[in-house]
């Protein structure tokens, strides 16, 4: 068995205790025996514990796994496609597009939108708005990508699109009500606990589709590591591959942002953690390793968020930079050497 495979198996095994800890730890500590009993369908003496586990903590843990995996793989695909170790899902403005969509709903329309006979409010309004915002930015980027071959120029375009979206959000914040600004700020802090159990299957199906499409790109991604010219000599259409990777990362990032809010650093840092652990750039090991590591990091971050217990929940985006920034600093210093 190869070293990378062994490490991926061991890292994957770590998901089980971390997932279980997410079900146990919180403002109410639930014994392990009761958690297992509830998961097995035998219930618990306390009905409130059953509700907490099945309707709050279980969807939260599943959301962490899905979001962590999708953002991590998105970062890996972009770092390989653009040969830039600091590329991440947020660099192309997809997060900003989703945020702009949510800002329009929360700040301009008061939390709900009515189109004809269809009325969307609350979570569904935010979800649809985030998808539309991210999709609009994705369409804009693909339009530019069809005309711009230079990867650096496309990166700059993505950054500029993000700045424009951020500027629009700032204007909306300025003219919005205090309640609207507060709601938007809470969403912007990121949260794995906002997805109801009824929405988990939708989240899981879209994420699984994106991850499968990513795995199918392993061979051309490995060829791309040898250089664009070499890859084209081997029959890889690098422009088509780049645009296809943008579509995959757009799908994964838009989905994660729509369901969980803009999550920082996971997409940027986790691919580097996977590379450091596996010691290889081979995507046959790296993509599965990044998927697993993304889930592990997201679950660990969620545990840290709920550690205060009755003291409240730490915002997710206050935890992810603490875990991700040291990794990025290490990569930068290593690059200088």
Which residues does each PLM region occupy?
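Alpha-helical transmembrane segments in inner-membrane proteins
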Residues: 1-337
């Amino acid at each position: 068995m190869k070293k990378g495979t062994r490490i991926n198996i061991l890292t994957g095994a770590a998901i089980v205790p971390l997932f279980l800890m997410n079900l146990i730890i919180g403002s109410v500590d639930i014994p392990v025996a009761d958690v297992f009993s509830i998961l097995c369908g035998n219930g618990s003496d306390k009905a409130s514990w059953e509700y907490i586990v099945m309707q709050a903590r279980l969807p939260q843990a599943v959301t962490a796994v899905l979001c962590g995996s999708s953002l991590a793989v998105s970062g890996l695909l972009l770092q390989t496609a653009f040969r830039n170790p600091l590329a991440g899902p947020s660099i192309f403005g997809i997060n900003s597009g989703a945020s702009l969509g949510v800002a329009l709903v929360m700040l301009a329309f008061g939390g709900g939108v009515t189109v004809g006979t269809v009325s969307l409010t609350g979570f569904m309004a935010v979800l649809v708005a985030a998808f539309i915002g991210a999709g609009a930015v994705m369409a804009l980027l693909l339009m530019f990508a069809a005309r711009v071959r230079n990867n650096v120029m496309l990166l700059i375009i993505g950054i500029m699109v993000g700045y424009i979206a951020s500027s629009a959000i700032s204007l909306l914040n300025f003219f919005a009500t205090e309640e609207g600004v507060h709601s938007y700020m809470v969403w912007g802090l990121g949260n794995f606990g906002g997805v109801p159990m009824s929405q988990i299957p939708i989240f899981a199906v879209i994420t699984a589709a994106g991850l499968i499409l990513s795995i199918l790109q392993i061979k051309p991604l490995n060829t791309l590591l040898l250089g664009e010219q070499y890859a084209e000599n081997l029959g890889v259409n690098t422009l088509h591959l780049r645009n296809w990777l943008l579509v995959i990362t757009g799908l994964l990032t838009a989905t994660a942002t729509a369901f969980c809010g803009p999550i920082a650093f996971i997409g940027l840092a986790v691919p580097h953690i996977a590379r450091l652990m596996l010691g290889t750039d081979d995507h046959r090991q790296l993509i599965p390793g990044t998927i697993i590591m993304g889930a592990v990091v997201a679950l660990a971050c969620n545990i840290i968020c709920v550690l205060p217990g009755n003291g409240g929940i730490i915002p997710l985006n206050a935890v992810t930079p603490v875990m991700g920034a040291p990794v990025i600093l290490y990569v930068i210093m290593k690059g200088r050497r």
